[in-house]
Amino acid sequence: MPRPSAGSHHNDKLHVKKGDTVIVLRGKHKGQTGKVLLALPRDAKVVVEGVNLVTKHVKPSAANPQGGIEQREAALHASKVALVDPETGKPTRVRKAIVDGKKVRVAVKSGKVID
């Protein structure tokens, strides 16, 4: 039986999900905000709208006969983003709480229910 690789210990859970508004905390895109377009929990990455744009060379195909060069969002590591507090507009951590018998996410800084 093969040994698992050193990087295979993953949690498969993220603190953000698709549709959340997040702010980038580190790197060259620090301070930019956007909506999460795609969450990749197995890789611990997220794709944020308008952030970390890369140039992609596209070959001509039936769907795109012209081909060409286009800009796309690339994935960021989930640890580099934080949820934007709906009340203050600043980055916040997230806590889970049970409200009316339902498990919801709560902003740590303001205590406001996120979903």
UniProtKB/Swiss-Prot annotation:
Highest taxon of source: Bacteria
GO cellular component, one term: ribonucleoprotein complex
Record's keyword annotation contains Nucleus: no
Record keywords, A-Z: Ribonucleoprotein, Ribosomal protein, RNA-binding, rRNA-binding
GO molecular function: rRNA binding; structural constituent of ribosome
Function: One of two assembly initiator proteins, it binds directly to the 5'-end of the 23S rRNA, where it nucleates assembly of the 50S subunit.
Family under the similarity heading: Belongs to the universal ribosomal protein uL24 family.
Keyword Transport: no
Subunit structure: Part of the 50S ribosomal subunit.
Protein name: Large ribosomal subunit protein uL24
Gene Ontology process terms (BP): translation
Originating species: Deinococcus geothermalis (strain DSM 11300 / CIP 105573 / AG-3a)
